[in-house]
Amino acid sequence: LIIYIISLYVGNYFALKFHEKEPYYSAVGASGAVTGVVYSSVVLYPEMKLIMLFLPIPLPAYIFGICYLLYSIYGMNKNLGNIGHTAHFGGAIGGLLITLIIKPEIIDENLWIILLMITPILLFAINLKKKII
């Protein structure tokens, strides 16, 4: 429950800050929280297999997590559909961080996978900083 609540807050806060200069932007729902729970499970069990509906091939969870973050970044940059990509992205960050805080030993167990999963977040932050400057 704590992962859900923190992911909900982080996802909504991220969306609020990302879209604060867009007066007509609106979003509702808890998909950022759900994304945080999913991303938390990906961090805890990176080798579990996940299947996407449009690609019925089992993928390791960490590959799914990386691809999902890249898709969210793409969706944010292109304003794709009526989907809260920013809330999903923020929720994933919240789920990742709270999981690492609650269970820090996972860092030793899966350091390289966690670094791979953090890479899209860092690339997004660098790109965002370049746009601001």
Where do the model's predicted regions map?
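A detector for small-residue-rich transmembrane helices and their helix-helix packing motifs
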Residues: 1-133
